[in-house]
């Protein structure tokens, strides 16, 4: 089980990462990582970076049946 400090340190070392990458690297369940990232965000230590839907090269994101599931959400330190 990872700690809040380990999540922060990993973001410091890697720059920006997705929650799934952090979960896999630290061998911690993703819901726990999501909660830790939200805590870091509320403390002003981390920032959420979301891709814009206009970044889709094929233009098929708007009609995607998964509804923006292809858009990535990154996390980085402030």
UniProtKB/Swiss-Prot annotation:
Keyword Transcription in annotation: yes
Residues annotated to bind iron-sulfur cluster: 56, 61, 64, 70
InterPro entries assigned to the protein according to its UniProt record, in alphabetical order: FeoC (IPR023732), Tscrpt_reg_HTH_FeoC (IPR015102), WH-like_DNA-bd_sf (IPR036388), WH_DNA-bd_sf (IPR036390)
Keyword Repressor: yes
GO molecular-function term, one example from the UniProt record: iron ion binding
Pfam families noted in UniProt: FeoC
Keywords: DNA-binding, Iron, Iron-sulfur, Metal-binding, Repressor, Transcription, Transcription regulation
Function (record text): May function as a transcriptional regulator that controls feoABC expression.
Similarity section: Belongs to the FeoC family.
Designated name of the protein: Probable [Fe-S]-dependent transcriptional repressor
Organism per entry: Escherichia coli O45:K1 (strain S88 / ExPEC)
């Amino acid at each position: 089980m990872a700690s809040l400090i380990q999540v922060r340190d990993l973001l410091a070392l890697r720059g920006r990462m997705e929650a799934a990458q952090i979960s896999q690297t630290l061998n911690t369940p993703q819901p726990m990582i999501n909660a830790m990232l939200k805590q870091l965000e509320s403390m002003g230590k981390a920032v959420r970076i979301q891709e814009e839907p206009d970044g889709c090269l094929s233009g098929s994101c708007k009609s995607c049946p998964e509804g923006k599931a292809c858009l990535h959400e990154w996390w980085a330190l402030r």
